[in-house]
Amino acid sequence: MEMNKKTIFVTGATSGVGLKITELLVAQGHIVYATGRNEVALKTLQRLGANVIQADLTSLTAIDKVCAQLPALDVAIFSAGVGKFAIAPMLTDEDITQMVELNIRVPIYLAKRIATKMIAREQGQLIFIGSQAGKVATPKASVYAATKHAIVGFTNGLRMELAPYNIKVTAIHPGPIDTPFLDKVNDESGYRESLGRLLLTPEEVAQATVKTIERPVREVNLPRMMGWTSKLYALAPATIEFLAKPLFNKK
């Protein structure tokens, strides 16, 4: 059965998961508005059929300009994000600011503006690309995990706030993904290889995300085993930290 054509906005559309989501949506015939910083990637998406908007979303002025260019939306997918991996004392203030800006403030500012218009229409869906780091923090990712914990809290509260207006809120929480994002992790310890089947492809995450448009759900945990691990972590954090310490410390 073909998916009904929808008008969809995607952030972080020029790389990684956001790029694959955008390509998949365009291929399915949806009307897609894609934003990102990479001008070359945006031109490629434009040739595929996407409506592109180049912007640095860490600026409130830019956020307002982008929102002013958007039509009535059926779905908004917030995929833009950044990670800097080191123990917290070794991160620069700029590293921390960048993660807080792009991973927390940007999706919240955008969701506020887009949800306001969806409320008036009493329909819509907001999809946030979170992370398993929002469920289970690990060494060298404490600040990154904090930003993703914020998204877990925000989506859980927002879901209840928007339910009376027939607006769905979905959170996608993937584990490690085989993208340039992962290259920022020190790989001398063999972290990438140690992940084995836990390592996701951008295509897998994109397909799981797009699937929730037709069948909205509360959240998606990828891979499934990590979803179960996060549930066990909530019950016995010290035990999970002890058992998973060898893997955690490879990062």
Report the location of each language-model feature.
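Residue(s) in the substrate-gating loop at a strand-loop-helix junction
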Residues: S131
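Substrate-binding pocket helix/loop in short-chain dehydrogenase/reductase
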Residues: I87-A88, T92-V100
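Active-site helix of classical SDR
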Residues: A111, T147
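Conserved glycine-rich cofactor-binding loop
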Residues: T14-S15
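SDR active-site lid
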Residues: P164-R224
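Alpha-helical segment proximal to the catalytic Tyr-Lys
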Residues: T116, M160-A163
